[in-house]
A protein has these predicted regions:
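Polybasic/polar functional segments that serve as interface/processing modules
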Residues: 1-7
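Active-site-flanking beta-strand signature of metal-NTP-handling nucleotidyl enzymes
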Residues: 8-14
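Beta-strand elements of well-folded, non-transmembrane domains
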Residues: 15-17, 65
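Short amphipathic alpha-helical segments
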Residues: 21-45
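Short, glycine- and small/hydrophobic-rich beta-strand elements in well-ordered beta-sheets
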Residues: 37-66
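An amphipathic, aromatic/His-enriched active-site/gating alpha helix that lines ligand/cofactor pockets
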Residues: 43, 64-104
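Charge-rich, low-complexity N-terminal segments
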Residues: 79, 115-116
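Eukaryote-biased recognition of C-terminal alpha-helical segments
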Residues: 106-112
């Protein structure tokens, strides 16, 4: 991937604060459905990492210039397997306290960079 400049996006979301729910969510992410991984890659996303502390999730996305959240939303709306996955994941997730009801992953703003 040398020479390709990737853009980084960081997002946050909460899980329901229940140990069994959190373990189930982690288990699903050990075996993400192949169709979900394909849809992620097809959107221009090159790397995704999700971190967990307590019940707070932090996701880092690295994507090429073909990626946009609007394009991904359209692709997801047209993909029944992604819709099935999202519906299932929402049973484990809850929005951040500072968001409107039903809001899922929230884009975060970078406030510090060591090299800038």
């Amino acid at each position: 991937m040398s020479g390709i400049k990737l853009k980084k996006y960081c997002l946050a979301l909460d899980l329901k604060d229940d140990a069994k729910i959190i373990e189930s969510y982690k288990s699903y992410h050990q075996n993400v459905w192949p169709e979900i991984n394909k849809s992620i890659k097809d959107s221009g996303i090159k790397e995704v990492e999700i971190y967990l502390t307590g019940n707070r999730l932090f996701m880092i996305i690295e994507a090429d210039d073909s990626f946009s959240f609007d394009k991904k939303a359209i692709m997801d709306a047209e993909n029944s397997k992604v819709q099935q996955w999202e519906k299932l994941m929402w049973t484990f997730q809850k929005g951040l306290p500072n968001t409107k009801k039903g809001t899922k992953w929230v884009l975060m703003n970078r406030i510090y960079n060591l090299n800038k």
